[in-house]
């Protein structure tokens, strides 16, 4: 296999682990190539030019080469323009990164999801100027993640007749099928939503308090289905703090 070289690819660092004495192995989310594993040689050295650049939640341009699954980072440039995440926003950022690591296979491109992630990190970094709250920002990202990875059925159509839900009626989300009217023998853990909320969620509109509340249950349910037994540490912390 020929060695591949990629230059100046937009990326964010999702996670990093030490490698040997002076290097790091990075899990990065790139716009065109999806999740990539890169080794940053010498990045732990005190005077390394990479050390101050490889920060989470900051837009980067990265270059790499190699032919194995673990490529070698050859350059990383900080793009700038985003304030650092702090407080609750920082915890939410770690939650987003954990979701991406759990959901996305390596080297599958998700350009739309990358753009949504960048928009979400920007919103979190400028939270004081945002009209949306933390929950609304997170719900929009979770929905995009489920849609772009193919884990969410259509919310604006009933599976039984392919018609739009009626605003005042109640519906459940049935695993492997999608939205349908509530029945008396439905399992208690299936999320129940009004047609109004389903139609709003389908267009990523979480501005109504009832929709936001019902969407929280739906997103937890859908994420849980596909994460199965995998535990999201940051999500549990946020739940305990009643932030999501």
UniProtKB/Swiss-Prot annotation:
Recorded hits in Pfam families, A to Z, give: RecO_C, RecO_N
Q: Return the InterPro entries for the record.
A: ARFGAP/RecO, DNA_rep/recomb_RecO_N, NA-bd_OB-fold, RecO, RecO_C
Q: Biological process (GO) annotations?
A: DNA recombination; double-strand break repair
Organism superkingdom: Bacteria
Entry's Gene Ontology cellular component terms? bacterial nucleoid
Q: What does this protein do?
A: Involved in DNA repair and RecF pathway recombination.
Q: Which family does it belong to?
A: Belongs to the RecO family.
Q: Write the protein's name.
A: DNA repair protein RecO
Q: Whose protein is this, by species?
A: Polynucleobacter necessarius subsp. necessarius (strain STIR1)
């Amino acid at each position: 296999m020929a060695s591949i070289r990629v230059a100046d690819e937009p990326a964010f660092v999702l996670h990093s682990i030490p490698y040997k004495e002076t290097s790091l192995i990075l899990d990065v989310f790139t716009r065109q190539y999806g999740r990539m594993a890169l080794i940053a040689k010498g990045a732990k050295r005190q005077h390394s030019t990479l050390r101050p650049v490889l920060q989470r939640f900051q837009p980067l341009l990265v270059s790499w080469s190699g032919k194995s699954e673990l490529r070698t980072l050859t350059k990383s440039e900080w793009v700038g323009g985003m304030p650092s995440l702090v407080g609750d926003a920082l915890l939410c950022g770690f939650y987003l990164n954990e979701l991406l690591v759990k959901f996305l296979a390596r080297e599958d491109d998700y350009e739309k999801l990358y753009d949504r992630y960048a928009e979400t990190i920007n919103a979190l970094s400028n939270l004081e100027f945002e009209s949306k709250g933390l929950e609304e920002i997170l719900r929009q990202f979770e929905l995009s993640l489920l849609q772009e990875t193919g884990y969410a059925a259509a919310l604006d159509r009933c599976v039984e007749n392919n018609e739009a839900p009626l605003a005042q009626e109640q519906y459940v989300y049935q695993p492997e099928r999608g939205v349908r009217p509530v029945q008396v023998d439905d399992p208690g853990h299936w999320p129940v939503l009004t047609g109004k909320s389903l139609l709003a969620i389908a267009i990523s509109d979480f501005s109504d308090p009832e929709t936001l509340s019902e969407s929280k249950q739906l997103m937890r349910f859908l994420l849980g289905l596909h994460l199965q037994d995998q535990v999201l540490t940051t999500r549990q912390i946020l739940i305990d703090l009643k932030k999501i």
